[in-house]
Amino acid sequence: MSDFQREQRKNEHVEIAMAQSDAMHSDFDKMRFVHHSIPSINVNDIDLTSQTPDLTMAYPIYINAMTGGSEWTKNINEKLAVVARETRLAMAVGSTHAALRNPRMAETFTIARKMNPEGMIFSNVGADVPVEKALEAVELLEAQALQIHVNSPQELVMPEGNREFVTWLDNIASIVSRVSVPVIIKEVGFGMSKELMHDLQQIGVKYVDVSGKGGTNFVDIENERRANKDMDYLSSWGQSTVESLLETTAYQSEISVFASGGLRTPLDAIKSLALGAKATGMSRPFLNQVENNGIAHTVAYVESFIEHMKSIMTMLDAKNIDDLTQKQIVFSPEIMSWIEQRSLNIHRG
């Protein structure tokens, strides 16, 4: 594939992603908090700091991986980096493969560091990159963490995608052992299982982003690029973010779990944190905000999102993220069926 074709593919991904709409129904709607009428705290008591063994985030929200690798996406990364700087959010760039192949494309990613020199930035590579390239991806952005995206459904629907996956787990293990910053194993919208969590724990992984279905749909994106558009029947493949977080429960004491995929509102973010996530990521909402409404409006959107989270936490009498994990939740019969059929041990306060 030529560099021009790769740039075109990056732009197609963004165009199709922006055109997608939120799912009509979400598993976040199938879980409810139990309301208690009189909180014992005030809004000003809320501490939204997200703390993991290696990373401290001012807020449990991050701009998740989406783009880079073309002139248009350079402009997007530049604007998102300004938003991240002004709101103190962490930010992940999209796959840096284009820059690792062609130095001319490096600036479409490094613009994020240029615009946000003191901020927290995650670099991003695929599960098949050589260790040396993973190290290069971290150095490229002076990144505080490295996302490794695992995206087999996307690859298999992508006309020119990868068809070989047998080396992925071993390669991830090699990268984890060599890279000096936290390595986050990141799905791309298909969710994670407890079996995968076991495998990742065995090779030393300490961070995952479950990225469940319901948000940006890469099966649909790649199917739109197919000549016959003949794989749309896979559109609903995978686990939701709620199901994925429940799948991780037994591993949350050893692995820091991030949640993304289909988060629409501050309440969805709070529900993710209550299920054990340390932070929550969004891609398309930020992309659409910054492209359609500009930087200032997007900054205001983030500030409002944070204030709404504080209000919800006050209603829940939760001073911090850890408190949220003790709050009572009622699940729908459908989610309870998933918990039972998957033999998941869910214990709550």
From Swiss-Prot:
GO biological process: isoprenoid biosynthetic process
Localization: Cytoplasm
Annotated Gene Ontology cellular component terms: cytoplasm
Record: residues binding substrate: 9-10, 95-97, 154
Pfam family, one: FMN_dh
EC number(s) reported in the record: 5.3.3.2
Reaction equation(s) it catalyzes: isopentenyl diphosphate = dimethylallyl diphosphate
InterPro entries per record: Aldolase_TIM (IPR013785), FMN-dep_DH (IPR000262), IPdP_isomerase (IPR011179)
Keywords, alphabetical: Cytoplasm, Flavoprotein, FMN, Isomerase, Isoprene biosynthesis, Magnesium, Metal-binding, NADP
Cofactor: FMN; NADPH; Mg(2+)
Sites where the protein binds Mg(2+): 155
CDD domains membership: IDI-2_FMN
GO molecular function: FMN binding; isopentenyl-diphosphate delta-isomerase activity; magnesium ion binding; NADPH binding; oxidoreductase activity
Superkingdom field: Bacteria
Classification via HAMAP family: Idi_2
Assembly mode: Homooctamer. Dimer of tetramers.
Known role: Involved in the biosynthesis of isoprenoids. Catalyzes the 1,3-allylic rearrangement of the homoallylic substrate isopentenyl (IPP) to its allylic isomer, dimethylallyl diphosphate (DMAPP).
UniProt name for this protein: Isopentenyl-diphosphate delta-isomerase
Higher taxonomy: Bacteria, Bacillati, Bacillota, Bacilli, Bacillales
